[in-house]
Amino acid sequence: GGRFDLGVGIGYRQLEFDQFGRKISHRPSLVEEGIEILRRAWSGEPVNFEGKRFSVGDLCITPTPKRAPKVLLGGMAPPAIDRAARIADGFLCTGGIGMDVYVEALKNNGKSPEEGNIILGCWAIIAEDPEAEAANVGEHVLYQSNEYIRWGAFGPPDQTPLFPDA
């Protein structure tokens, strides 16, 4: 036991929600209810849950983990970072964005900073010849960066979708 941690995020591409018939505006409650259902299922007891987004009856999973996996929650907007401090075992931090906000959110949720867990996501090249390896992966890194840019929201402030509840 203890070899698996679950990292989750609430999503941000409309396509992700369309494919499951879900509303993107329901992201916060979807992830909160989903995490609650998972935690209860890992306990080994049958789960009966009726929420705003999910309805589960007599859900059982086997084998039951010896130790429930840690749930790590990502996000960049202050509400998402607060959610990580409130309901998760750690914060998936992209490029260092939001670390200070997370520490404050822990305090605001009655937790000490020592109870927090920050997992930093960033590119790292570990190789005998980092420059040669960077040349090999550069095309792939650029592709990923361009995809994130393409998926982004662009336009004048009054016409660009915002996710204040993220």
Please state what every model-predicted region is.
Residues 1-166:
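Active-site-adjacent structural elements that line small-molecule/cofactor binding pockets in enzymes
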